[in-house]
Amino acid sequence: ECLGFGKGCNPSNDQCCKSANLVCSRKHRWCKYEI
């Protein structure tokens, strides 16, 4: 189970959906698309 776009996340334990190119923003602490 991974976190979708805009979901709150923990930068030190990034559980955002890698298959959707999502990463946890250290600044905003939510899943965003990796550029």
Swiss-Prot record:
Kindly list the cysteine pairs connected by disulfide bridges.
C2-C17, C9-C24, C16-C31
MF annotations from Gene Ontology: ion channel inhibitor activity; sodium channel regulator activity; toxin activity
Domain statement: The presence of a 'disulfide through disulfide knot' structurally defines this protein as a knottin.
Q: Where is the signal peptide?
A: none
Q: Which GO terms describe its cellular component?
A: extracellular region; host cell presynaptic membrane
- Indicate what this protein is called per its UniProt record: Mu-theraphotoxin-Hhn1a
Q: Pfam families given for it?
A: Toxin_12
Q: Which family does it belong to?
A: Belongs to the neurotoxin 10 (Hwtx-1) family. 22 (Htx-4) subfamily.
User: How does this chain assemble?
Assistant: Monomer.
> What is this protein's function per UniProt?
Inhibits selectively tetrodotoxin-sensitive voltage-gated sodium channels (Nav). Does not act by binding to receptor site 3 to slow the inactivation kinetics of sodium currents.
Location, primary (coarse class):
secreted
- Note from the entry: IC(50) is 42.3 nM on rat neurons.
Q: Which UniProt keywords apply?
A: Disulfide bond, Ion channel impairing toxin, Knottin, Neurotoxin, Presynaptic neurotoxin, Secreted, Toxin, Voltage-gated sodium channel impairing toxin
Q: Where in the cell is it found?
A: Secreted
Q: In which tissues is it expressed?
A: Expressed by the venom gland.
